[in-house]
Amino acid sequence: MSNQHTLLISNLLPVGSNISTWWNFGSMLLTCLILQITTGFFLAIHYTANINLAFSSVTHIMRDVPYGWIMQNLHAIGASMFFICIYIHIARGLYYGLYMNKNVWLSGTTLLITLMATAFFGYVLPWGQMSFWAATVITNLLTAIPYLGTTITTWLWGGFSINDPTLTRFFALHFILPFAIISLSSIHIILLHNKGSNNPLGTNSDIDKIPFHPYHSYKDTLMTISLFILMFTILSFSPDLFNDPENFSKANPLVTPQHIKPEWYFLFAYGILRSIPNKLGGTLALLMSVTILMTAPFTHTSHMRPMTFRPLAQMAFWTLIATFITITWTASKPVEPPFIIISQMTSILYFLFFIMNPLLGWTENKIMMNN
């Protein structure tokens, strides 16, 4: 009976035999989420959401709380790992045409927006210089909304400037949103298993399926262990690798940092925002930088689902990756030549991918038909 039970469990989730390592990032994201919620809970126990005490409470966690430095650094490094995994996860989806499973793709994009909001609120909590000024700049973008902008901004701040009520509500939101992420992740996984996962060839894998366990479960375990090794290596040798030096100073509303910038994982969107010399235009471009992903399922024109056998689409895809990295780099630099023009050019190239993709699909279809 026990053998039959094991076989039953193994066959509950038949998976295509040819899915590659790029399909392991979903489980790695789940691992990151569990780690963030666990470390976040222990940090919340010792954190004080008050503008006079927040910075001191983070210092207290680092210095006085047993293993507090591990919790704090793991939480900070874990956030970066989370975004590295999610960007690879999205890139894999774009390359292999996984967006054709519309419900999964749209729920995933909603998850990304929720995750970015959560990370933004979390970045404000230490109440360092960069935390304060990044919050001031980003929340101030709401004033670009016609008619309602100023009212919404004042309501979000809880006053006429970023102050104690702002920090309190940002802490509340940072605490509650991960549970929304759990719910959305559950929906994402349920929708995925409704049709089943795709594979690198983009073909129907019903005729060639293997049990998830032990084959893919061991592969997942290997990648998760690799993730932990990388995280603990950074934690041990360079715990402040992803931190901004400016954030080691307490927030001072009277002194503006020379160069205001968010965490590295928001720099691509911030670079697009900064490349447009108009407040409303920049805000719309910032929103579009993420929401444009939602257009992918509706603009797919190629007869082939993945880019595996589409050389023109592959060139466009790798140009997008190079563009993403370049925008991230330029956004970390001051607003001066040559970074302004590079940022503007790469921003155009970023959006051009989503416009060119359907046109390249049509072109490739024509080439195939002629041959």
From Swiss-Prot:
Compartments in which it is found: Mitochondrion inner membrane
Quick check: keyword Transmembrane in the entry? yes
Write out the residues that bind a ubiquinone.
Answer: 193
Q: Which Pfam families does this one have?
A: Cytochrom_B_C, Cytochrome_B
Q: Which cofactor does it need?
A: heme b
Looking at the UniProt entry, the stretches that span the membrane are 25-45, 69-90, 105-125, 170-190, 218-238, 280-300, 312-332, 339-358
Q: Which GO terms describe its cellular component?
A: mitochondrial inner membrane; respiratory chain complex III
Which example biological process does GO assign this protein?
Answer: mitochondrial electron transport, ubiquinol to cytochrome c
Tell me which residues bind heme b b566.
89, 188
InterPro entries cross-referenced by the UniProt entry: Cyt_b/b6_C, Cyt_b/b6_C_sf, Cyt_b/b6_N, Cytb/b6-like_sf, Cytochrome_b, Cytochrome_b_C_euk/bac, Cytochrome_b_N_euk/bac, Di-haem_cyt_TM
Q: Which family does it belong to?
A: Belongs to the cytochrome b family.
| Name of the protein this chain belongs to | Cytochrome b
Record the organism: Sinomicrurus kelloggi
Which lineage?
A: Eukaryota, Metazoa, Chordata, Craniata, Vertebrata
